[in-house]
Amino acid sequence: MPVDRANSVALNRSAVGPASRAGLVDPAQFELPVPLGSRHPLDRRTCLRLGLSVLAGGRMVDMFGLAAQAAGSQPALARRPTSCIFVWLDGGPSHFETFDPKPDAPREIRGEFDSIATRIAGVRFSEHLGRLAAMNDRFTLVRSIRHTDSNHGAGIHYMLTGAPTRMPVGCNSYVSDHPSLGAVTARERPGPSGMPGYFALPEMPRSGGPNFLGARYAPFIVPDDPNRSDFRMHDVAPPQAVGLSRVERRRQLRSQLDRLPRVRDAAAADPARASDAFYEQSYQLMSSPAAQQAFDLEREPDSVRDAYGRTPLGQRALLARRLVEAGVPFITLFDGGWDSHVDIFPTLRDKLPPLDQALATLIDDLDTRGLLETTLVVALGEFGRAPKITQLPTGKFPGREHWPGAMSVLFAGCGTPRGLVLGATDRLGS
């Protein structure tokens, strides 16, 4: 829906910094409406820092300075962020059934779920997000992010790279016109010794790759399910029948062969030579004590693992926290299945509780350990869902269509203000 510019603050190109001008972000397409008279006005530079500086690994300032303003003091600089955990809800989660319910709207808009009160007066969440509702005084929620493309391919590309696609693309397209935020972060802020700067658990989203930055900035993908009792990251530990010393001898032999002129010349002409980077990356992980420790979830007490939830998403969130502790700059937590054209209510009854538990525990755990000051947690998808519920002719299997005109995005940590809800949709959620 168009935003009333007399009653909002819009981001425009005059605020774009060097990273944006390089094609990483086009903030002119985002608008964050703020009611006139708000105690917390937004300026363009402030909004850009929320969406750009942190995700690109740059310096993060106490952007809004809100706590300092309330206390009558000067805004303080937050410490340089060390990590970002990017919770990607693939398919486009419904804002109605998550962070922006409309309890007073007609039933065909509000849906089946009830809404519940949160820690902030007048702000309500879905009934299935009870843990996050009880702690929303510890994160910022933006309810008015939007763009203009309702196809998955273009929407994902835009949200993961900050740039529109060069031409219209369909829902099933895999587009990579620009490097992703994770790849840019890995290039600007390399990972700790022996570890990549960019991990994806359990898979890389479409448009989540490095594009022209090169394969060395692609995410290291961890497909294994850490919720399984036999979880073992196969690329981090050598095969059980092969010791690390034998792996090292193989590596030396491979290096000697690569130095042969004909092998070297053939490799130089072969685009597949990027596999060398992955081979070396795997070896570095095998020989890194920090990596071995980060992936050893058995070091965690059962109480901590239970708190995150004994689900694939919950245990991956715990693994993400351990990677943050190891110094990894960017971790994507991929959770699919949010494209709810049909069966939206039974689907989300199953999906929301694990998300609620994992995300709330992750934020709380990082905060308790003093890591939230230097870790940005972001939760989002490629778009929201349409206001009006659609049904098959039989009246069964209701769902919601794609809606790029409004979505909710959660930000926690790295100096982002606590307890703020920015922007708004109208009474119908459009």
Which residue ranges define each predicted feature?
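Ligand-binding pockets and gating/stacking loops
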Residues: 2-430
